[in-house]
């Protein structure tokens, strides 16, 4: 887990072996996605002399707040791509701004270490809205055609952006920029609820249809009740 942070000293290899052995002694290992489970399986397989006893692996995803967050009408006018969260160094928002087509607006909600640097670019189709309260989440998520989710390359299996599931609840598709075959990459591609690379063409009608599929998926697969039932089955 230390590779994405750039740690290469021998002591971190020792720490990794200690943690891998601890994982191997568990009866049950829960993960948030398929990529995370893949990493856990390989960690356990690396530990010697445990072939007679393997932990059970179960995936339990984050849930979508489908009761509080409801689909709202899509804004008229230009296509709006929205990012809500930490405006930090590892989110890659500078690269997003580089790739942003002129006909698409990028709206940023939140604050962070890169905020002032990005503002200084004075890009005409990029707008900064600052932080927001959790009580405003429904309103914020509805203020776009498609929502941006990023995950740093090298973070495969080490994190699943939980914001994704409330985006689905809001009835908005996802533009995911991150490791291939990570959980959100698979989720988006398998269900047709967005893009995992910059689309060649932006179409409001297509985005709206993807958004309807996203909400339907949230209700059928990721409600609080469904996810809590998964926990009950392993307790």
What do the PLM-derived regions correspond to, one by one?
Residues 51-54, 66-80:
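Nucleotide-sugar donor-binding and catalytic loop/hinge architecture
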């Amino acid at each position: 887990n230390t590779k994405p942070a750039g740690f290469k000293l021998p002591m971190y290899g020792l720490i990794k072996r200690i943690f891998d052995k601890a994982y191997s002694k568990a009866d049950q290992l829960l993960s948030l996605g398929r990529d995370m489970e893949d990493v856990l399986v390989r960690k356990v397989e690396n530990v010697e002399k445990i072939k007679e006893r393997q932990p059970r692996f179960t995936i339990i995803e984050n849930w979508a707040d489908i009761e509080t967050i409801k689909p709202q009408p899509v804004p008229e006018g230009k296509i709006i791509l929205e990012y809500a969260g930490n405006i930090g160094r590892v989110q890659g928002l500078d690269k997003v701004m580089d790739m942003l087509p002129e006909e698409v607006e990028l709206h940023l909600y939140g604050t962070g270490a890169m905020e002032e640097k990005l503002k200084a670019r004075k890009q005409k189709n990029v707008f900064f809205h600052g932080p927001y309260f959790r009580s405003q989440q429904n309103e914020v998520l509805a203020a776009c055609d498609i929502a941006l989710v990023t995950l740093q390359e090298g973070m495969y299996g080490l994190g699943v952006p939980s914001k994704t599931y409330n985006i689905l609840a809001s009835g908005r598709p996802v533009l995911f920029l991150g490791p291939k075959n990570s959980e959100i990459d698979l989720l988006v591609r398998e269900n047709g609820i967005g893009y995992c690379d910059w689309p060649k063409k932006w179409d409001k009608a297509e985005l709206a249809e993807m958004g309807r599929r996203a909400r339907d998926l949230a209700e059928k697969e990721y409600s609080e009740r469904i996810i809590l039932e998964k926990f009950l089955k392993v307790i």
